[in-house]
Amino acid sequence: MKTFYLSIVCMVMSFSMTLMAQNPFRTEGDVIIDFNISPNGKMMVYKERTADGAMNIKIKELKTGKVSSLISMKLKWSDMKEIYSGVDFLTNNEIIYVKGENMVSFNLKNKKRRDLAQLPDILGYIKALDNGKGVYFTDAEQLYYLSIKEGSISEINKVDLGVFSMSIDKDNRLFYTIGKQVFCLDKAGNEVEEITSEIAKLVVNPYLIEATGSKNSFIVAGKEGIFKVDISKGQSIKLTDNEKENPVTKIRLTPNGKTLYYQRNLDYNKISTLEL
């Protein structure tokens, strides 16, 4: 009986050590272009570039740490749209990315790809609605919305300085940052409101934002660190420091709000984890 319990303890310790070893999680590629979390919080999709010019899209199961390769592309530097564009989940079973001149989706179950729309320019961020009905994306000058059903692209707003981050809350409002400014686009996609002053009261020089499950609560990266803020209560909690020489560049929160994944500027192929 003692041997049995000792075996169980060893298994638990081994599993815990495995999870610890995965924080930070290092990819096989040299540079992570983008990563996002599935709507059910079970998977991470990430896009990486290797030294030999290959572009890979992979899925990581967050519970087990298992990594599966989905798509591999050998690109030239002239393939700018594919190199610099992001990747996201359209649904739990479908991802979206850029292939050639088009926004495309890839079904994780049947492995089929479908073209969604032809793109206007070199893309940066891609952020899909959790209901799978639409996708927000940006280039260097413009914020767009793609309707999946209609296959049509609409111009939403000018973003002349380029978007640093995008996040969609449970009410399908889009939050995005341009430099040290924070904006909110209503769920109808019609009205843009700047909310920088509300955030800046709690975080110095905010430049990344991630929505949480609560309407007025966000994860925000600023000059002095990453914070969890509640603008309705005027409260902020510091989660971790922001290194001056190696600042945070990407933050992704799981849907249940319990785990934050983030990447720093010089951590080219490394994603760190913070339990909240």
Question: Each predicted region: which residue ranges?
Answer:
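Bacterial Sec-dependent N-terminal signal peptides
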Residues: 1-24
